A protein has these predicted regions:
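Membrane-embedded alpha-helical bundles of multi-pass transporters/translocases
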Residues: 2-223
Length: 223
């Protein structure tokens, strides 16, 4: 029994295809999150022309509310039973489509909204985004359970971090290129950038999650 465990920990489990598709999923997932992180405030100020007081209120609300919600969402994820597909993979597959939709809505505002109604809309979208990001972080956790081989796991985690960092910065290049084509319409630049990140993000995350396997099974025991 002991030799079987040792052999299992030394065997290479993650295939090249699985490894590459997982990293692609990570790259474009963080490309989605990076789009909001890099350009949401610019959209609010430069396109919607919200005031400094409105921007301050918005930033306060979207810092506090999602932070509180993240505790409950994290508790749900932690207490969630591991199914046949794993613990984290189903969550990543479930959340990517609504997350992409909210990404688009983060850079689109219905005409005619102003004042309190505009703020309610913006905060609602931002809170949804924060909640989906907490769920979507499951895609990062998958790297920890892809293989019982410690060296292989460290390698996956290392490349995941690199892919995530590069993907997070990718929207800066995407919007820059779009800006060379549509120079005089900043709002259009953002919505096109969000659309590209959303479309490719859905495809790559679903493709990666359909290929990746969670090979470490664990249970959370209550004492």
């Amino acid at each position: 029994m002991g030799s079987t465990v040792i052999q299992n920990q030394e065997t290479k489990h993650v295939k090249t295809k699985e490894f590459v598709l997982y990293l692609l999923g990570i790259f474009f997932y963080t490309c989605m999150t990076g789009m909001v992180g890099s350009y949401r405030n610019a959209y609010l100020v430069n396109v919607l022309k919200i005031t400094d007081d409105e921007a301050s209120l918005f930033n306060t609300l979207v810092s506090v509310i999602p932070f509180v919600l993240s505790f409950f969402i994290s508790m749900y994820i932690d207490g969630r039973k591991t199914g046949k597909s794993g613990k984290f993979k189903p969550l990543a597959m479930f959340v990517v489509v609504p997350m992409a939709a909210v990404l688009m809505l983060s850079f689109w505002t219905p005409k005619g909204l102003s004042g309190t109604f505009l703020m309610i809309y913006l905060v609602t979208i931002a809170v949804l985004w924060g909640a989906f990001c907490t769920l979507g972080n499951s895609i990062n956790m998958i790297a920890n359970v892809m293989t019982p081989n410690m060296k292989e796991r460290d390698n996956v985690i290392s490349f995941r971090s690199i892919s995530s960092a590069v993907g997070n910065s990718a929207p800066l290049v995407i919007v820059l290129v779009i800006g060379l084509i549509w120079k005089d319409n900043e709002g259009l630049q953002y919505i096109i950038g969000a659309g590209l990140c959303s479309a490719v993000g859905i495809i790559t995350v679903l493709l990666g999650m359909s290929t990746v396997k969670e090979r470490i099974t664990y249970t959370a025991e209550k004492k």
